Amino acid sequence: MSKRLRSNDVCADCSGPDPSWASVNRGTLICDECCSVHRSLGRHISQVRHLKHTPWPPTLLQMVETLYSNGANSIWEHSLLDPASVMSGRRKANPQDKVHPNKAEFIRAKYQMLAFVHRLPCRDDDSVTAKDLSKQLHSSVRTGNLETCLRLLSLGAQANFFHPEKGSTPLHVASKAGQILQAELLAVYGADPGTHDSSGKTPVDYARQGGHRELAERLVEIQYELTDRLAFYLCGRKPDHKNGQHFIIPQMADSSLDLSELAKAAKKKLQSLSNHLFEELAMDVYDEVDRRETDAVWLATQNHSTLVTETTVVPFLPVNPEYSSTRNQGRQKLARFNAHEFATLVIDILSDAKRRQQGSPLSRSKDNVELILRTVSNQHSTESQDNDQPDYDSVASDEDTDVETRASRTNRQKSLDSDLSDGPVTVQEFMEVKHALVASEAKRQQLMKVNNNLSGELRIMQKKLQTLQSENSSLRRQATASACQVQTASDHKDTVSHSSLKRRPSARGSRPMSMYETGSGQKPYLPMGEANHPEESRTRLQPFPTHIGRSALVTSSSSLPSFPSTLSWSRDESTRRASRLEKQNSTPESDYDNTAYDPEPDDTVSGRKGRQRSMLWQGDGPLPDTAEPHAVPSPALPSTEDVIRKTEQITKNIQELLRAAQENKHDSYIPCSERIHAAVTEMAALFPKKPKSDTVRTSLRLLTASAYRLQSECRKALPGDSSLPTDVQLVTQQVIQCAYDIAKAAKQLVTITTKENSS
């Protein structure tokens, strides 16, 4: 989409060669290092886009290149061009300067503080000055002089200024004159294409009256820029505004939208927001989408050895001082959403934005009648309707696209005409509605029967859970008694052998055998390798059907095995490995917040239990203190050189994966993810099994869990046996997010080891 860069293009901030990024609202081209600082400032200061790897509207790119070639950078460095500035000691950054603090301080002073912009003479009333500047902008946009308009905007002119005498805004004037680049600049600074002038006309109306068709179509795209960007982020498609399609509501590829009561309540709360609050939330989500997409481009284009250098990382949205602290905190919490949660939020916002724009009420009973009639006509045409199909599969929702086929539109109009006509109801129409009601009643009865069965199974599982809790308490008491016996018998060495002591763990050592942790919420600690022996199992809970929500269970695994009644710790190594392999193969693939990592077995039982505990804990906060009594935290950390070498190996493999994603080579996902997983395992092996630092443990947990989650996501990219289509775009976004988490964890480990080894 972007034009070929000229050989004499340099970075506007440090004069470095071959800039590959653009600051849209500043009209400048910048290099990678300066771009990292721009991103840390936030979109309210600088809106950065990659020149080659980001889709550009042609006129927007033309506007940026025109401003850059005509010296727009001199607007932001006006006082530096004055020879007197050399005497004052102020100078521009050089390519050889460090990013921190040299380049970062200069860029903040240039764009955030506007320290080098030409200042007008001071006046007593700033509002009068802004009004005069806005009037000048109103007059200047009818010409093609972009630099003058950008200079006025930099001094405080308002892009949405309504001229009291002429009764219009600058965008009305630019549209009437056919100045499409001026319209792009005004839109970047917040001009609204839907504003009406004193005659009740919008800029789109003036563009169409003047015969400026391209400008009119572009103004419509700008008007729907927010929803278009959100839809493109999820499914890689944009609505066809030329043909009247203004919204696309994507659907989850695996139909895994969260249908829990909490999700439904959140959606109702979203729908109850006022238009003003809903607009603020939508803009915040738009900024988060921009941050995530820019992160993906950044990871795909950078030399990944720079991940351990001083370039700035943007893990969440920067603070905007114009917003309240509550809103800034909410904006930053958006970064904590995983790919599935964020996609669900975006879909809800798109659906409600469409409803609000069309003025549709929350109640849709009339639409339901229409949809019943459409279903009846389909039943008569096919005669083979599947009654086992849930209701929501045959009922359309706000996720339907606006463009429908002519045949379906005609059928709907006929149904509406027959339903809303004032004439008598025919026998055929009466029978159709009657059959539809009978089918609905049959489905309702079937669902009630299924609900009763599930309620019975739930009661059975609750009873089994109580039984397991009582057995758990009994085992704890037995372990405590055994510990007391071991302590008493320790004075009689001739009666107690070393092997018997080894077979009697202490009370604290038996704590990892807990079947159910009441304080761990919905993520219990489930050891591996000890409970997966069918000959020693007492009770095994049956799994819920696949359509039952996660809130009904206390664990996400398919079965809940109990512990053996006798503690036989003397199995041979082959039996333990076979048990672990069986458990690994029986674990179902689930969401990545439930993914378990299975480490290699150690030679001793204590080492194996310690590693299983550290890798399988899925609660919040630090790991629970359930390790062996004699386990001592190891303060030793590997050398910085070894960690950097392993990190470079990881980032090299991530770069290959991102290159495959960029070239749509989905069959390369799994080999790349396996190499990344192997590199992560090698890096994790450098660190002690129980690091002393909580930060190291947290980073290692994030590193290994993200690598395992990456393998799971890469498998989804290959076409499987499922009849549901795979949303490759969404899978790719999730793969990139996992790769970013791995890179972030690796950099954290490099930073920690560097700091610890240098101190």
Swiss-Prot record:
InterPro entries linked: Ankyrin_rpt, Ankyrin_rpt-contain_sf, ARFGAP/RecO, ArfGAP_dom, ArfGAP_dom_sf, GIT-like, GIT1/2_CC, GIT1_C
Transmembrane parts of this sequence: none
Coiled-coil residue spans: 451-478
CDD domains: ArfGap_GIT2 (cd08847)
Biased composition (Acidic residues): 385-402
Domain of life: Eukaryota
Pfam families in the record: Ank_2, ArfGap, GIT1_C, GIT_CC, GIT_SHD
Annotated Arf-GAP domain residues: 1-124
Molecular function as annotated in GO: GTPase activator activity; protein-containing complex binding; small GTPase binding; zinc ion binding
Segments for region (Disordered): 376-422, 469-641
Keywords, in A-Z order: ANK repeat, Coiled coil, GTPase activation, Metal-binding, Repeat, Zinc, Zinc-finger
GO terms (BP aspect): behavioral response to pain; brain development; presynaptic modulation of chemical synaptic transmission; regulation of ARF protein signal transduction; regulation of G protein-coupled receptor signaling pathway; regulation of synaptic vesicle exocytosis; synaptic vesicle recycling
Biased composition annotated in UniProt, kind: Polar residues: 469-489
Regions of compositional bias (Low complexity) in chain numbering: 555-569
Bias type Basic and acidic residues, positions: 570-583
Positions of ANK repeats: 132-161, 166-198, 199-228
Listed GO CC annotations: calyx of Held; nucleoplasm; presynapse; synapse
Statement: the UniProt record of this protein carries the keyword Zinc: yes
Span of zinc fingers (C4-type): 11-34
PANTHER family (alphabetical): ARF GTPASE-ACTIVATING PROTEIN GIT2, G PROTEIN-COUPLED RECEPTOR KINASE INTERACTING ARFGAP
Role: GTPase-activating protein for ADP ribosylation factor family members, including ARF1.
Assembly notes: May form heterooligomers with GIT1. Directly interacts with protein Piccolo/PCLO. Interacts with PPFIA1 and PPFIA2. Interacts with ARHGEF7. Identified in a complex with ARHGEF6 and BIN2. Interacts with PAK3. Interacts with PXN/paxillin. Interacts with TGFB1I1. Forms a complex with EFNB1 and GRB4/NCK2.
Name of the protein in its database record: ARF GTPase-activating protein GIT2
The organism of origin for this protein: Rattus norvegicus
